[in-house]
A protein has these predicted regions:
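Active-site gating loop/helix substructures
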Residues: 159-252, 256-287, 366-378
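Patatin-like phospholipase
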Residues: 16-24, 30-139, 145, 182-194, ...
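N-terminal low-complexity/intrinsically disordered extensions
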Residues: 1-21, 112, 413, 423-435
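C-terminal helical/tail subdomains of lipid-metabolizing enzymes
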Residues: 132, 145, 308-435
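Alpha-helix termini
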Residues: 44-53, 153-158, 312-321
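Active-site periphery "cap/insert" segments of enzyme catalytic domains
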Residues: 129-170, 177-181
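Acidic, Ser/Thr-rich peripheral helices and adjacent loops at domain boundaries
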Residues: 268-309, 351, 355
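Extended hydrophobic secondary-structure segments that form protein cores and membrane-embedded regions
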Residues: 22-25, 57-64, 165-171, 328-332
């Protein structure tokens, strides 16, 4: 059976002076809690190796909900353990109503009106002022991020050398281009590729809400681009090369944390086949999976091919090409997160369950339908806590690979996952009020 997570490329023990290490955190709504579990395990293995202090990732690129995790790590790059502990605290205490309006009134105001417009748009077109911008209102998320992430610290981390660069990606509804906004202390020239550009910017919370604005689900966010306002949505849309920003920013080794399985084992697809006409929820889940998951797997395979090709070239020929090998470690879920979400659909607030039921999300457990869509919206501790546990266990199961990738000595785990979950809340302890 093929491994659902590709192995690291050219992995070998190395001295701590190896080139800059980048971190890629992809999108996926509530699925981003899995990233936190991976990071918690990496932090523990790092402590076991006798290291602490500043982040091992001076270059971080985040997309969608991964942008929130990326910005948190970057703004606390002087204390990697504290940043990760804070993220664990956030995600295992997060609730739906801290991300989007989940009360009955809020759903009536946005979701039901949006569904009515979709079904009776021809009849209500004259009431343009009432047209909603999205299925759900994510203004609670913006309020949470303004309190949670101290973006002013990013300049300090860059100036002190704890960070080299932070990149946040978004997709412009205005121009159709995929845009990577990046902030650095040292000058790095922006890059231009087909339908994707990079722009140096002073990153803000608004960049995070733009990058995490799941299409149809959350409203677009206006950002300034070359002095003109443009409307942006989720950075996973039209992101054909999610690993590219870290490479452009100078990373020579990259840890990629996915939000879905990179490859399905034989036989697993047939069990998940839709046997009748798909519901709106199943179609939406399929579309979101295409946006969030497919590009990363393709980009990893592309990088593998480039690395393999370069390894076949004579030394002189390798020196003559601008291409360079980039070592990458990919950690992605060993379980289908759709199935995991199906076990926890019942934990959603009644108003959200009612809204999702209207588009075909029904049942719980093995008999559930539409759970792919639910997996992006299930910001509840029962689900995010399981994702954190899964991220930890997947990473610890590949402990030897992780230790080799970072050049840490191979050794047994010094702390069990349960104890890792009980660590103090890091920088989150200094924040006012409950998360």
């Amino acid at each position: 059976m093929p491994n659902a997570n590709p192995p690291i490329i050219n992995a070998a023990s190395r001295p701590s002076s190896a080139g800059p290490c980048g971190l890629i955190l992809t999108g996926g709504g509530a699925r981003a809690a899995y990233q936190v579990g991976v990071l918690a395990a990496v932090a523990q293995l790092r402590r076991d190796a006798g290291f602490s202090g500043a982040s091992p990732f001076p270059i971080i690129a985040g997309t969608s909900a991964g942008a929130i995790n990326a910005a948190t790590l970057a703004c606390h790059a002087d204390d990697f353990d504290g940043a990760v502990d804070g993220l664990v605290h956030l995600w295992q205490n997060l609730h739906v109503d801290q991300i989007y309006s989940a009360d009955a009134f809020g759903i009536i105001r946005t979701g039901a009106r949006w569904l009515r417009l979709m079904s009776l748009g021809w009849a209500v077109a004259r009431w343009r002022r009432t047209q909603p911008r999205s299925l759900l209102d994510n203004s609670p998320l913006a309020r949470l991020l303004h309190r949670w992430i101290q973006m002013a610290r990013l300049d300090e981390m860059l100036a002190a050398g704890h960070m080299h660069a932070l990149a946040i990606s978004g997709s412009s509804y205005t121009s159709g281009q995929h845009v990577t906004f990046y902030q650095t202390h040292k000058p790095i020239s922006p890059w231009l590729r087909s339908q994707r550009i990079a722009v140096k910017a002073q990153l803000t919370v608004e960049h995070l809400t733009a990058s995490s604005a799941i299409p149809f689900i959350f409203p677009a966010q206006s950002l300034d681009l070359d002095g003109q306002p443009e409307w942006f949505g989720d950075g996973s849309m039209r992101q054909s090369a999610p690993i590219s920003p870290a490479i452009h920013l100078g990373a020579e080794r990259i840890l990629v944390i996915g939000a879905g399985r990179m490859h399905e084992p034989p036989g697993s697809r047939r069990a998940a086949l839709v046997t009748g006409p798909p519901s709106m929820a199943q179609i939406a889940g399929h579309a979101l999976s295409n946006i969030f998951l497919d590009a990363l797997a393709v980009d990893v395979e592309r990088l593998q091919r480039i690395n393999n090709t370069l390894s076949l070239l004579p030394q002189q020929a390798r020196e003559a090409t601008p291409l360079r090998p980039v070592e990458v470690l990919v950690i992605a879920p060993s379980r289908r997160l759709d199935d995991l979400a199906a076990e926890h659909q019942g934990s959603l607030p009644p108003a959200i369950k009612g809204l999702l039921r209207s588009v075909g999300v029904v049942g719980e457990g093995k008999g559930a339908s539409g759970s792919a869509l639910t997996s992006y919206l299930l910001f509840e501790p029962s689900f995010t806590g399981e994702l954190i546990n899964l991220g930890m266990s997947d990473t610890l199961a590949r402990r030897a690979e992780v230790q080799a990738f970072f050049g840490w000595p191979a050794q047994a785990l010094q702390c069990d996952p349960a104890a890792m979950r009980r660590r103090k809340a890091g920088f989150a302890e200094t924040l006012p009020g409950p998360v």
